Curated annotation (Swiss-Prot):
This is Krueppel-like factor 13. GO terms for cellular component: chromatin; nucleus. It comes from Homo sapiens. Residues 26-35, 48-57 have a biased composition (Basic and acidic residues). Coiled coil: none annotated.
Amino acid sequence: MAAAAYVDHFAAECLVSMSSRAVVHGPREGPESRPEGAAVAATPTLPRVEERRDGKDSASLFVVARILADLNQQAPAPAPAERREGAAARKARTPCRLPPPAPEPTSPGAEGAAAAPPSPAWSEPEPEAGLEPEREPGPAGSGEPGLRQRVRRGRSRADLESPQRKHKCHYAGCEKVYGKSSHLKAHLRTHTGERPFACSWQDCNKKFARSDELARHYRTHTGEKKFSCPICEKRFMRSDHLTKHARRHANFHPGMLQRRGGGSRTGSLSDYSRSDASSPTISPASSP
């Protein structure tokens, strides 16, 4: 408001100063020093100068009048004090909502209902029917590989401690547990040194603790090479030798060995297995 009043006052002063024209007097000279021809020639030019000044003054007055009209059309912004007063007035007009009073218990059964606090008017709205609240994804549903590995490790440890694996080694310092008694029996031979599987090849007196070890050894006598490379068709006696060889090829993929599995692949899993599980006894006489 003060700025607008100052601008109006300044514009009014400009109008007053422009309306009162200053009279310009020429230099005073004696009548003797000025020739008559010069005085006569100067008199016609005075009205032209006055006309130019009148035109300039009227143009400037018109510009100032337009400025004043524009200022009057613009509404002044309210002061901060007026804004606070208006906000306080609006706040005083709006009624304050108070929560309803708690009903007084009239019977012993109503005391439990009265113990619950009343729901205020500003409580959060309940979710609509058919809409479930968002749930944070657990570690099992996350897509991070690190979390998946942790979950798998936790599951494997839980499987080891599960009651299904009840066949435990009774030797001191050995905490291995197996799900089948045959697996435990094969493991106990590592402690006792028992080797019930003997080679029946002529002049070969080797014995083994597991039947798969005997079958692997027997192929050294027969020369059987049933594990063939899927790329170069080389053959090997043991599946682990085939795997090492196949990895040297540039176009090798682990799925190649799995596709060519068949019956021979399933029977050769014990060749490179590190488990203590015992496989069915293979009679050397049945092999070619």
